[in-house]
Amino acid sequence: MEDLVCVGITHKEAEVEELEKARFESDEAVRDIVESFGLSGCVLLQTCNRVEVYASGARDRAEELGDLIHDDAWVKRGSEAVRHLFRVACGLESMMVGEQEILRQVKKAYDRAARLGTLDEALKIVFRRAINLGKRAREETRISEGAVSIGSAAVELAERELGSLHDKTVLVVGAGEMGKTVAKSLVDRGVRAVLVANRTYERAVELARDLGGEAVRFDELVDHLARSDVVVSATAAPHPVIHVDDVREALRKRDRRSPILIIDIANPRDVEEGVENIEDVEVRTIDDLRVIARENLERRRKEIPKVEKLIEEELSTVEEELEKLKERRLVADVAKSLHEIKDRELERALRRLKTGDPENVLQDFAEAYTKRLINVLTSAIMELPDEYRRAACRALRRASELNG
């Protein structure tokens, strides 16, 4: 495990502008990193909030690798690098604790490295473990429950007030970023239809296209209020654009008796004072959404110790798995060395067989091969630390007893 390193910079250490500068132009830069640093394997994880390189075989060049990203890049080695990856996959290192998207991004980074051929066995093990752990953390704890963004809070609020949104129509008033964010979250939840109204009709058309909805005329707002179940208002107007009389008239025009939920996220407010007093109308503001998001985020934070326990348990398991991988590699390396010794001695013996006595040649071959084996094994054992040397000697003793 000590051969694994992680270097990076995240939203915790840098502003958005710095993170943008740290980003590699192409996610396929991972190939260049492997070649430049002579790595065994490499995975590049780039998101809005982090630029991280996970590498195998970079222990002696970790700082150089960090400098490739940013002057202030941190370096984590061995178990700390693996623990960090596990925390990332579980959403503990995200700006919004427990968010789902990061797990998809980790899997995407892993799949890309696999496609580009930059995964070695060690990275395969830790990334597969991280992805599975990320799923378990969300299934076995409540780390991802509840809305923590303004958009998802709007969905939660709408479902609290109206139940399922699948048969609901959403009206977006204003074409600004905040309104678009909230509306997109509602659309992703599967609402029946989306209407977009804006004073500049062309902007309404543009946003409607992005949302897969219908652009409507701002001066026909009352008619469209009558069609809607959820209204998201987010204009930049200096005065209210949804008036008491408009809402009353819209209710009269409705062909059904059902509530209207108006989410006013404009500053100053888009909804005239008094609308909240109309029967069958619920008015909520961005403050209500923030309260929902804050409460849910606090609940998620209480789940962190449970997730950290899962991480430590998984870390012990992956350490054992990596140790076994290391042992398999060692056995393979020893076997390769012994085969090379055998091939050299055999080549020498075959040359001698052309002129020498076969029995003597074979006897010399066996003695030379045995002597070389003993020298290789003895030298390797004597270079080990005391506790490992004693264990190796015990293993050799058992092997000789079994052979006897």
From Swiss-Prot:
Its EC number is 1.2.1.70. It comes from the Archaea. Optimum pH is 8.1. The record marks H84 as: Important for activity. Substrate binds at T47, C48, N49, R50, S94, E99, Q100, E101, Q105. Pathway: Porphyrin-containing compound metabolism; protoporphyrin-IX biosynthesis; 5-aminolevulinate from L-glutamyl-tRNA(Glu): step 1/2. It is an enzyme of class 1 (oxidoreductase). InterPro entries: 4pyrrol_synth_GluRdtase, 4pyrrol_synth_GluRdtase_dimer, 4pyrrol_synth_GluRdtase_N, GluRdtase_CS, GluRdtase_dimer_dom_sf, GluRdtase_N_sf, NAD(P)-bd_dom_sf, Shikm_DH/Glu-tRNA_Rdtase. The keyword NADP applies. It catalyses: (S)-4-amino-5-oxopentanoate + tRNA(Glu) + NADP(+) = L-glutamyl-tRNA(Glu) + NADPH + H(+). Changing H84N: 30% of wild-type reductase activity. 15% of wild-type esterase activity. GO terms for molecular function: glutamyl-tRNA reductase activity; NADP binding. GO terms for biological process: protoporphyrinogen IX biosynthetic process from glutamate. It holds the Pfam family GlutR_dimer. NADP(+) binds at G174, A175, G176, E177, M178, G179. Transmembrane segments: none annotated. The keyword S-adenosyl-L-methionine does not apply. Belongs to the glutamyl-tRNA reductase family. Homotetramer. This is Glutamyl-tRNA reductase.
